[in-house]
């Protein structure tokens, strides 16, 4: 008896084109920028204020989710189908943690069909003290 083996054909895998999704999330707005790997060319830039009507809705997680969906669609149309995510908060004098829209934007990017690589927090944190804007002796009223 002869056993005829069928040659297995390799599955065609889609070539991944990587980009970087920069998510800046503060207590006032969420801005999502998708660039190429070098960061030189901006592929898509959408903010929470571009997808909502009222200013009070800009920092909401819903606005961040809609902005992330829109940015992902623009990136997929330009050929980028995989991203590394870099999340940033205000830092410096502001909050050292990202705002309320950061996690919602990450979830939306994952659900939109983009392949997620690394997720990194790049909030600028001072390692010494920073002088307050009011100066050395404080604000005199």
UniProtKB/Swiss-Prot annotation:
InterPro entries: Ribosomal_uS11, Ribosomal_uS11_archaeal, Ribosomal_uS11_CS, Ribosomal_uS11_sf
Example GO biological process: translation
GO molecular function terms attached to this record: rRNA binding; structural constituent of ribosome
Gene Ontology annotations for the cellular component aspect, listed alphabetically: ribonucleoprotein complex; ribosome
Cysteine-cysteine disulfides: none
Pfam families with a match to the protein in the record: Ribosomal_S11
Keywords, alphabetical: Ribonucleoprotein, Ribosomal protein, RNA-binding, rRNA-binding
UniProt-listed SUPFAM superfamilies: Translational machinery components
Lineage: superkingdom: Archaea
NCBIfam families: arch_S11P (TIGR03628), PRK09607.1 (NF007176)
Protein task: Located on the platform of the 30S subunit.
Family affiliation: Belongs to the universal ribosomal protein uS11 family.
Quaternary structure and interacting proteins, as annotated: Part of the 30S ribosomal subunit.
PANTHER family cross-referenced by the UniProt entry: 40S RIBOSOMAL PROTEIN S14/30S RIBOSOMAL PROTEIN S11
HAMAP family to which the protein is assigned, alphabetical: Ribosomal_uS11
Protein name, entry field: Small ribosomal subunit protein uS11
Species per Swiss-Prot/TrEMBL record: Pyrobaculum calidifontis (strain DSM 21063 / JCM 11548 / VA1)
Recorded name of the encoding gene: rps11
């Amino acid at each position: 008896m002869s056993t005829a083996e069928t040659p297995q054909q390799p599955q065609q895998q889609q070539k991944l084109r990587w980009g970087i999704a920069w998510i800046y999330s503060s207590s006032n707005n969420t801005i999502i920028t998708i660039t190429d790997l070098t960061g030189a060319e901006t592929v898509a830039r959408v903010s929470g204020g571009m997808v909502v009507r009222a200013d009070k809705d800009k920092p909401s997680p819903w606005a961040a989710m809609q902005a992330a969906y829109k940015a992902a669609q623009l990136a997929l149309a330009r050929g980028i189908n995989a991203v590394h995510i870099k999340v940033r908060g205000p830092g410096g004098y502001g909050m050292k943690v990202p705002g309320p829209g950061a996690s919602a934007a990450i979830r939306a990017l994952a659900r939109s069909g983009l392949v997620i690589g690394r997720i990194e927090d790049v909030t600028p944190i001072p390692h010494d003290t920073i002088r307050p804007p009011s100066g050395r002796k404080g604000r005199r009223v």
